[in-house]
């Protein structure tokens, strides 16, 4: 055994209102932390779309197989969306965490709260705020340009933001690169926490006591 204190992975849960920047931040974060963090891969009953890869984009199963996974406690959480089931496979998450690989979840507050409730030991949650509602409105307008849709998205954003208080960390996304570095700092600090260190007692006794 060497004195490299290897850490378990974390479940990095990120939420933001539409236009808040979590999709772009997620992509950049995974690129910067290659080999340390991967995106969550869900199980689904829907048909694969063009170029989707089994095990990378989704795990594709039949409805009977999906129900079996749920009934045997192999799903962390699941939901039915537009007639298809989606769920987070327990084994995929835990195998990676126990091998020191972290999982990134880019989800809404409801999904975040479910994971916080059932996997609090492993979850690190970050809520990403826009600089202001005016700035969010500008981003949404640049994205779609439809006033009715923007007004609805702003209402949904206000509701989403009203749930930010339960998250471990809150950042304000003034600048994408700065936000990525802030979350990267959170990631590094959380991985250094004592309770995430594997074989800590053995390493300390072998090398320091």
Curated annotation (Swiss-Prot):
InterPro entries in alphabetical order: GK/Ca_channel_bsu (IPR008145), Guanylate_kin-like_dom (IPR008144), Guanylate_kinase (IPR017665), Guanylate_kinase_CS (IPR020590), P-loop_NTPase (IPR027417)
Primary localization class, coarse: cytoplasm
CDD domains with a match to the protein in the record:
GMPK
Q: Which GO terms describe its molecular function?
A: ATP binding; guanylate kinase activity
Question: What gene name does this entry carry?
Answer: gmk
Stated name of the protein = Guanylate kinase
**EC number(s) given by UniProt:** 2.7.4.8
PANTHER family assigned to the protein according to its UniProt record, in alphabetical order: GUANYLATE KINASE (PTHR23117:SF13), GUANYLATE KINASE-RELATED (PTHR23117)
User: Which species is this record about?
Assistant: Ehrlichia ruminantium (strain Gardel)
The UniProt entry, under Pfam families, shows:
Guanylate_kin
